[in-house]
Amino acid sequence: MAFSFPDHFRFADSHEYAFADDALVRIGISEFAVDQLGDIVFVDLPEEGTAIAKGESFGSVESVKAVEDMYAPVSGEIVHRNNSVLASPEELQNDPHGEGWLLIIRPDNPAQLTELMDSETYSKKISA
């Protein structure tokens, strides 16, 4: 399957994406990760107001194949979580780069985004 990643997205090695949205950062998991998981049946996300730290687990995704932890690509405080994905995990399955986003955070250090892979580098990584 050929994957397409938006140019403004930045990616962690663990397949989470992040991108700046004004002064905030939107976080989700890549289309590649969703494809690898298969049918997603449950998503667990922390409450709004929770602090997350880069590289630490912030929730999990359960599919018919496995339960996988998700890791914060940047540090910050959760200002919004996508409750639609919690109620209907298929939104993550159907549109991981759009309506299936997971969290919006207020980043502690927006420069952490530059430490992540750009779309081209990520595409090469998953193709190797």
Curated annotation (Swiss-Prot):
One Pfam family this sequence matches: GCV_H
Signal peptide: none
PROSITE patterns, per database record: BIOTINYL_LIPOYL, LIPOYL
Gene3D superfamilies: 2.40.50.100
SUPFAM superfamilies: Single hybrid motif
Keywords: Lipoyl
Start and end residues of each Lipoyl-binding domain: 24-106
Family to which this protein belongs: Belongs to the GcvH family.
Subunit text: The glycine cleavage system is composed of four proteins: P, T, L and H.
Protein name as catalogued: Glycine cleavage system H protein
Native organism taxonomy: Bacteria, Bacillati, Cyanobacteriota, Cyanophyceae, Synechococcales
